[in-house]
Amino acid sequence: MSCQPFTSTDTFIPLNSESSATLPLIMHPSAAECLPVSNHATNVMSTATGLHYSVPFCHYGNQSSTYGVMAGSLTPCLYKFPDHTLSHGFPPMHQPLLSEDPTAADFKQELRRKSKLVEEPIDMDSPEIRELEKFANEFKVRRIKLGYTQTNVGEALAAVHGSEFSQTTICRFENLQLSFKNACKLKAILSKWLEEAEQVGALYNEKVGANERKRKRRTTISIAAKDALERHFGEQNKPSSQEILRMAEELNLEKEVVRVWFCNRRQREKRVKTSLNQSLFTISKEHLECR
């Protein structure tokens, strides 16, 4: 037999602390067949399948009662909730939502662990901090050695990576005034730039060194060698290639040195003759004017 809702002829007396010991509970005639009276809530749950309404699990942790059982009382509630009132109450919650999912619990623990790591302050004596300080000092020294200013570095990086790089950024990095996260990001960029700048500097130094090697050192000729060359110049001011080679071997000089000496000597002789001619012309002109 199924349970039926109360009619107008069915009455019951509410229980309270004063009348619970004297007044009997008037129950529906067929109530005993629907729900046996039990002193434990688990018996009510086991017989709840015969009721007209579902008995959802209570999601409040501090309550052990269910719909159909009076909270804090051992007397069962035998009336039926109307459907429209049940629809406005708390909807039944699925069991997976009520129970703690192990995967979700692990995820929450991992999230709390990561957030804790983010919030923890950086240890100033950590190896990462020491390495960052060492790189900042080395970067400044190597930048100055290469001849670049902070503005040069900022403009070079801004042309490649964007306008967020400037002289102020490089200055704050060298003075360790950036956050640890931003300093680590900038360290990788500056390390790459420094490597490229040193490669360019090495190529430039190699080119300059090659040009310097082309210029030979000035040769010093001894007084005895100069006297011998002067005698040869008095005899022949334009010696041939064979004569230059012979003189170079005799004086233990390079052939090119002897050749250049004769060229310079002829130029000096020419300047002396020109100067003498001008002086003679000036003297002659003055002498004629005096007459």
Swiss-Prot record:
CDD domains named in the record:
homeodomain
Output the Gene Ontology terms for molecular function. DNA-binding transcription factor activity, RNA polymerase II-specific; RNA polymerase II cis-regulatory region sequence-specific DNA binding
Keyword set includes Repressor? no
Keywords, sorted A to Z: Activator, DNA-binding, Homeobox, Nucleus, Transcription, Transcription regulation
One Pfam family of this chain: Homeodomain
SMART domains membership: HOX, POU
Output the superkingdom of the source species.
Eukaryota
- Its chief place of residence is nucleus
Which InterPro entries does the record associate with it? HD, Homeobox_CS, Homeodomain-like_sf, Lambda_DNA-bd_dom_sf, POU, POU_dom, POU_domain_TF
For this chain the motif 9aaTAD maps to 5-13
Protein's name in the database: Pituitary-specific positive transcription factor 1
**What gene is this protein translated from?**
POU1F1
